[in-house]
A protein has these predicted regions:
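Glycine-rich phosphate-binding loops that contact phosphosugars or nucleotide phosphates
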Residues: 1-101, 107-112
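Internal, active-site/partner-interface "lid" segment
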Residues: 112-143
Length: 143
């Protein structure tokens, strides 16, 4: 979701889910890059290792995770998640919705930082998708 949001605003972004690719990507980063690490728990060993590597090469870290987690302690900036989970396992986790909200807030703030440029970018995305999908003018800006 974060990749889809940020690429619309012209950001070069690579979403890595594979632990080997996370480590390889981390070694290519510097202080000119930003790592945005998203984790509902903040304790996944593979993610923590990649973030530590990126940090060792000078990349700043923004974490969207639990405020009291190891990932949060590695980050320069934290967008904290605090989802009150229950034992009812048949519903989506509250933390998942918190993650989506944090991504929405981050994407909105980045969009508003350069409103004219981003309005034009979003217009282009909308036209390209409408042309491709053949739908009416009221379809979502995405998919």
């Amino acid at each position: 979701e974060l990749q889809v949001r940020l690429v619309r605003f012209g950001y070069s972004i690579a979403a890595c889910r594979d632990p080997v690719m996370m480590r390889i990507t981390a070694t290519s980063l510097s202080q000119e890059h930003l790592v945005i690490a998203c984790s509902l728990t903040g304790i996944t060993p593979e993610l923590l290792g990649a973030v530590e590597l990126a940090r060792s090469y000078g990349a700043p870290i923004l974490a969207i995770t639990r405020a009291d987690s190891p990932l949060a302690r590695l980050a320069d900036v934290v967008l904290p998640l605090q989802g009150a989970e229950t034992s009812f396992i048949y519903k989506p986790t509250a933390a998942r919705y918190g993650m989506l909200l944090a991504i929405d807030v981050l994407a909105t703030e980045l969009a508003l930082a350069h409103p004219e440029d981003n309005q034009e970018r979003l217009r282009r995305v909308k036209l390209a998708l409408d042309d491709y999908r053949g739908g009416d003018d009221h379809l979502p800006l995405g998919d």
